[in-house]
Amino acid sequence: AQIAAVMFAGQRKGLDFTLAEGQEVIVSGTVDVYEKDGRYQLYAKEIKREGRGDLFLRFEKLRDELEEMGMFDGCYKQPIPKYATRIGIVTASTGAAIRDIMNITSRRNPYVQLILYPALVQGEKAKYSIVQGIKTLDQMGLDVLIVGRGGGSMEDLWAFNEEMVARAIFECHTPVISAVGHETDVTIADYVADLRAPTPSAAAELAVFDYKQFE
């Protein structure tokens, strides 16, 4: 079962840690009805950290292992081409990410060609789909790849924390821009990519040059 929880700014000032996805916490407060939609909500007055959460621990463990292997080192980062004309995208064919990338591209440079690999970006099979997308587009001689998806919970974004996805990005001959979730979301893919964009829209801004600057 799930229940929405709210903590107002006054109570948040008393926290001695920063809340993040995947943490296990103990919450004290009151349950009341949210008048706008008639749903019950937990109004948190106190939050204490209890453990670190299995997903968060798995994330930290893999991040530390790959960092020790040198996979995040700057010497492996490929430069993003300034004037890309063919851009590969690994993301879902339906969703905010591809819509945002297409809108930004059409505004900045409608002459740029976008090649989409429609990947699963959530669920148990997503990691295999993302890896296949990276490998497929890497063989097409494109200028740059954007790999990512729109926002979600840590569980929703977990495919981008899988080791096989990190290795596919690391081994990719085409420069890769990671674009997973929102600005506050950080994944293993972000560490290993040649460039991290905070959102899919930002990735398009970084990958697509504005042709109007030459007018």
Go through each PLM region and give its residues.
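OB-fold and OB-like beta-barrel modules that bind single-stranded nucleic acids
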Residues: A1, A20-V33, A44
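Extended, highly charged clamp/arch subdomains and adjacent linkers
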Residues: Y40
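A short beta-strand motif that forms part of the nucleic acid-binding face
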Residues: A9, A44-E46, V192
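Short glycine/threonine-rich loop/turn motifs
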Residues: G88-E215
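Beta-strand/loop nucleic-acid-binding surfaces
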Residues: Q2-T18
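Extended, charge-rich, solvent-exposed interface segments
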Residues: D16, Y43-S106, P110
